[in-house]
Amino acid sequence: MYRPRSMVSPSRFFNPFMVALIVIITVGLLAMTAGLLIHFLAFDKRAYFYHSNFHILNVDYTEALNSPATHEYRTLSERIESMITDAFRESNLRSEFIRTHVVKLRKEGSGVVADVVMKFRSSKRNNKKAIKTRIQSVLQRLSSSGNLEIAPSNGITSLTDQDTENVLTQECGARPDLITLSEERIIGGTQAETGDWPWQVSLQLNNVHHCGGTLISNLWVLTAAHCFRSYSNPQQWTATFGVSTISPRLRVRVRAILAHAEYNSITRDNDIAVVQLDRPVTFTRNIHRVCLPAATQNIMPDSVAYVTGWGSLTYGGNTVTNLQQGEVRIVSSEVCNEPAGYGGSVLPGMLCAGVRSGAVDACQGDSGGPLVQEDTRRLWFVVGIVSWGYQCGLPNKPGVYTRVTAYRNWIRQQTGI
């Protein structure tokens, strides 16, 4: 009997090309859906900054509230920041609120007014005016907390990102995380990035890096006296700003060099100088001043500090062109002066810092540069000036720095700061 040849039904098998095409389209659609979801959940949000002021009703203004270096200024600012933070964490804005920061405490009558910047993160689609109204509503409910009575301002002002940067760079000691009121604090690696240490200065002799320095105002740089032992003519010197010594962001001539009159090149005592710039620098995100400590500020042994500069990476090596950073710890003078260390050569006006293994240290070319520490409000203070040491990075031979607190009055006498 004739049996026709069986035919393969096209409905039972797919062309491999069609299968691959369907898989690709399906994966693409899933990826697009996931991308849109991520975008709307995360990238759809943006930061909003606001400024307000608060009258502290039960605190009298004193001179101690004139500087962020004092215990009184720091304590009151932290109490105000904590009070505002708690208010938003307990409100319906808890998911939008990021951070607040007291920019300045100022006198009004006999009382104190706190200028405050606040950061929120919300969807770009939200009504900006409605957010502002909700913020104002929370602030109006502030009254007292921890024996602190606050009368909030009747209004708040919206700030652009640039406005916020302009406000916060007028404050001393602000690194990028504070300028953006970020929750992140990252200091890693050995090479600094643009803006990481905005007060770092390269003091250049005939346009070649010779010493480091620290910007302490728009006109003055703090450095070491030994930098000028052989070259004290201001006309030979320039100050540059930025992470690179060969392509700086800014170059300014030096007007005057004021080294400590009692600097001793043998004992290295009083190794401190200030340099007056030929013109004031304009503070920006990447160039602004560090905070000076109070004369009474206590520098605790084993506390973390950072040293920065363009010095050589090994003893006897060449200086580098890109700014380097190193994490060290404060070493007590007693330990530093032990026989295995410096055997009594570390004087009261000096400060030791390093690591036990000796792996991180200042070296040639770092002289005059800053040793800085961060306080509890993320403000940075210069506590030391790179001065001397035995070679570089040896165990039991930490770097020796001029102790800035010991010369706080001298700095004020020379600069008015």
Curated annotation (Swiss-Prot):
Residues 46-162 form the SEA domain. This is Transmembrane protease serine 11D. It is an enzyme of class 3 (hydrolase). One of its GO terms (biological process) is regulation of growth. The active site is at H226, D271, S367. Belongs to the peptidase S1 family. It is a single-pass type II membrane protein. Isoform 1 and isoform 2 are expressed in the esophagus, tongue and trachea. Isoform 2 is also highly expressed in the adrenal cortex and heart. It holds the Pfam family SEA. The keyword 4Fe-4S does not apply. Its EC number is 3.4.21.-. GO terms for cellular component: cell surface; extracellular region; plasma membrane. Disulfide bonds join C172-C291, C211-C227, C336-C352, C363-C392. PROSITE patterns: SEA, TRYPSIN_DOM, TRYPSIN_HIS, TRYPSIN_SER. InterPro entries: Pept_S1A_HAT/DESC1, Peptidase_S1_PA, Peptidase_S1_PA_chymotrypsin, Peptidase_S1A, SEA_dom, SEA_dom_sf, Trypsin_dom, TRYPSIN_HIS. SUPFAM superfamilies: SEA domain, Trypsin-like serine proteases. It is found in: Cell membrane. The lineage of its organism: Eukaryota, Metazoa, Chordata, Craniata, Vertebrata. Monomer. The gene is Tmprss11d. Residues 186-416 form the Peptidase S1 domain.
